[in-house]
């Protein structure tokens, strides 16, 4: 729960921040999401334009449906990171990192929590295949494999280790954010390997079934990190108060995915920009009602955690269904 402060100056709250030497209009950034062309024919180009217009940070997915140069052109200098599904073939990994560096990416986000695909029973029943290609990775796959995520995941490395974090950092020379740690032990392993940041996520609840909500893991991760490196948070963010609570719980940046794709589907780049603007406006309102003037103020807020102890009726008659 947010415990508001009173008798505070909240006339002109600001969400602007400086992160890694870059000025951003908000701590709300674009999460890596695959296959934007499923939502809009312009795909990642439209998303990148919307993020650029808003003035935030864009994270490119390995499974984008637009190639790197086109995304970079649409971003027009907006800071951008690359989300990396690590291949079993180090030659492929080196080539992708060479391309990423050439396009001016500022960091690499290593996805460590989804080296295989989840059991998507609906997709199996529907016989779903991608109707669009994924140019960043498909040149390395067997002919026709780009239409099936099974082939894509089979090319991903399942034997990930801290050494892979070291390899990416050494070869690319870029900061490496490890995406997926939800406990203290994984944080320590990542930092010992040279990670420059931790990305807390449960992959939007789309992979392992029965895992914790990402927000429930954030406090433990933040305590383990102890401000040694930045923390990015995603999964389940739908309102400005969610952003506020994540920042107050230890996150430095809050990434959104599904809401952006909804905006992309409905309004292209304008829809993307408006999703960010709407969430940011909500964040400002929550800041004013809580007594926070800046994002630094928000990050020093203490949330009140009330225990959740549900009780369930034993007698079905207590359900009062009739």
Regions found by a protein language model. Give the residues of each.
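Structural signal for hydrophobic packing residues in well-ordered secondary-structure cores
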Residues: 1-2, 75, 101-104, 112, ...
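Alpha/beta enzyme core
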Residues: 35, 48-49, 73-74, 88-233, ...
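Short FAD-binding loop at a beta-strand-to-alpha-helix junction that anchors the flavin cofactor
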Residues: 25-31, 235, 253-255
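C-terminal extensions of enzymes
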Residues: 260-261, 267-322
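A short, small-residue-rich loop immediately preceding and capping a beta-strand
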Residues: 56-60, 228-235
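A gly/proline- and charged-residue-enriched helix-loop-helix capping module
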Residues: 53-93
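Glycine-rich active-site/cofactor-binding loop and its immediate structural neighborhood
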Residues: 24-66
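An N-cap/entry alpha-helix motif that binds or orients negatively charged groups
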Residues: 1-21, 120, 127-160, 296-298, ...
């Amino acid at each position: 729960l947010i415990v508001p402060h009173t008798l505070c100056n909240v006339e002109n709250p600001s969400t602007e921040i400086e992160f890694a030497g870059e000025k951003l209009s908000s701590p709300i950034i674009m999460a890596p999401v695959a296959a934007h062309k499923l939502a809009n024919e312009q795909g990642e180009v439209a998303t990148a334009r919307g993020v650029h217009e808003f003035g935030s940070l864009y994270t490119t997915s390995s499974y984008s449906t637009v190639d790197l140069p086109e995304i970079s052109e649409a971003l027009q200098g907006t800071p951008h990171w690359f989300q990396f599904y690590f291949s079993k073939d180090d030659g492929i990994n080196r080539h992708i990192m060479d391309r990423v560096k050439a396009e001016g990416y500022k960091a690499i986000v290593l996805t460590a929590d989804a080296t295989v695909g989840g059991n998507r029973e609906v997709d199996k029943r529907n016989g779903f295949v991608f109707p669009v290609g994924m140019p960043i990775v498909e040149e390395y796959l067997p002919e026709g494999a780009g239409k099936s995520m099974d082939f894509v995941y089979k090319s991903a490395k399942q034997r990930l280790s801290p050494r892979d974090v070291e390899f990416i950092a050494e070869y690319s020379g870029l900061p490496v954010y490890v995406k997926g740690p939800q406990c203290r032990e994984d944080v320590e392993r990542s930092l010992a390997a040279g990670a420059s940041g931790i990305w807390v996520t449960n992959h939007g609840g789309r992979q392992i079934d029965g895992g914790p909500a990402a927000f429930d893991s954030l406090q433990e991760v933040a305590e383990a990190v102890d401000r040694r490196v930045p923390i990015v948070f995603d999964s389940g963010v739908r309102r400005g108060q969610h952003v506020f609570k994540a920042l107050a719980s230890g996150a430095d940046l809050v990434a959104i995915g599904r809401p952006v794709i909804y905006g992309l589907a409905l309004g292209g780049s304008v829809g993307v920009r408006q999703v960010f603007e709407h969430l940011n406006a909500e964040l400002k309102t929550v800041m004013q009602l809580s007594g926070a003037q800046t994002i630094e103020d928000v990050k020093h807020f203490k949330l009140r955690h009330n225990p959740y102890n549900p009780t369930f009726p034993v007698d079905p008659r207590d359900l009062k269904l009739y």
